[in-house]
Amino acid sequence: MRLCHKLRRRQSAAGKIPLFYRNGVPACLILRGCKHGRAGEDFVSSGGFAIMPLLPTGLTVSAYPPSSFLFRLTVAFIGALAFMQVYSIQSILPLLMRHFQADEVQIGLAVGVTVMGMGLMSPFIGMLSDAFGRRWMICSAIFFYSLPVALSAYAPTIESFTLLRFLVGIFVPGMTVCLIAYLGEEFESEHIGKLMAFYVCGTVFGGFSGRFLLGHLTQWIGWQFSMLLLSGLSFTGFLLVLWQLPPSRHFVAKPQLSTAMRSLVSHLHNRIVLSSCALGFFVLFSLVGCFSFINLRLAQAPYHLNTAQLANIFSVYLIGMIITPAATWLLRKFGAPRTMALSLALSVCGIVISLAQPLMLVFCGLILMSTGVFITQSATISYISLHVREGRSLATGLYYMAYYCGGTAGAWLCALSFQTWQWQGVVGTLLLAQCIGLIIIFSVIWQTSPRAQG
């Protein structure tokens, strides 16, 4: 008779029922007082103990504890896939302007509609995942996400290209919103901050790699074939996530529309959710506005950078990826409100430095700006996950709706500013957005956090 081998014994949540775990999943339950011999079809007994499997015999479940490096890597990989295609065209905007004979506003809209699609779909994706499950939504979104990327290589006009970029954005929340809800359900609060840091690092790396790869590949083989290669890379990512992402263990389907509407009404009266959404709006406003139009500035005199050199500018994202895990330490030491305020102030300093003429100073300004934004985003997401217990995926969806709408507004308003006043106008617009974000932190978020007040 085979009993459970290589299992780690723990107490149950109630502290009375001993459980044995395998790969972080409860594998069997030990019951006392059973008679010798078979105790039934579902469990076997020996020496007064019965071992009842909690998983069907022969079922292989890919599951990892939150401390597993492989699971953290999977979380970061999904974040990278989500943002690899979203901003990739920023590195070739000057080329696209020439190819489609578009002006600054039209090309800015091609960037902005992607994040607009993300914002519009975020709340609805939250409702759908509440009904159908997190893992299914994540894998489906990655698959469909690769299709409009491939089709955009054949777009004949700037209008059709912009429409396809909008469709790219439609599928991104299926990865971002559902993954955050998945983590919030599957793990305890002490693990969420570290997992969120890995997720944000993944999004940072994905944002960098999409721009970097498209810029360099375009220099070698042209932008159309480069888009096809990036689409194939996303499809490969779909297969890897389908294989590696563990099934949900604590998900309970809640398909009722009435439940979702009650959660929506509750969130719309929740100062924590509303203030986080408002802050998220101005965070992505700044990031998209800055990195969409810094390339137009650097493609002009006196820099005249080509597409590969412009792609290299986004290496500042790698520095942000290295520094962003510090958000976990900052959150533990200072709390979310102080972390948000410090990181947003750092971003303001970076924007001001970007006005300098030497390319190295511009580069340093972009490092400070992006690092501040990444830490603010990580702190805000953790703030929502820790303070919202009911309708978490819908709350996350509302946050991302505001976050991505901010990116759309940033692309449009900064395009108008660049068209009228060049980079100085963009900097003025970004500083206004950052100052409003600081006002939200000190006037609302600070007041709702006892730790910040203390």
Sequence positions of predicted segments:
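Cytoplasmic helix-loop-helix junction between adjacent transmembrane helices
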Residues: 164-202
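Helix-loop-helix hairpin linking two adjacent transmembrane segments in secondary transporters
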Residues: 189, 198-245
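Helix-breaking motifs and short loop linkers at transmembrane-helix boundaries and internal kinks
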Residues: 101, 133, 154-160, 171, ...
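Paired small-residue
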Residues: 148, 159-167, 360-368
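Helix-to-loop junctions at the C-terminal end of transmembrane segments
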Residues: 122-133, 323-335, 418
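Juxtamembrane intracellular "pre-TM" segments in multi-pass secondary transporters
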Residues: 56-65, 246-276
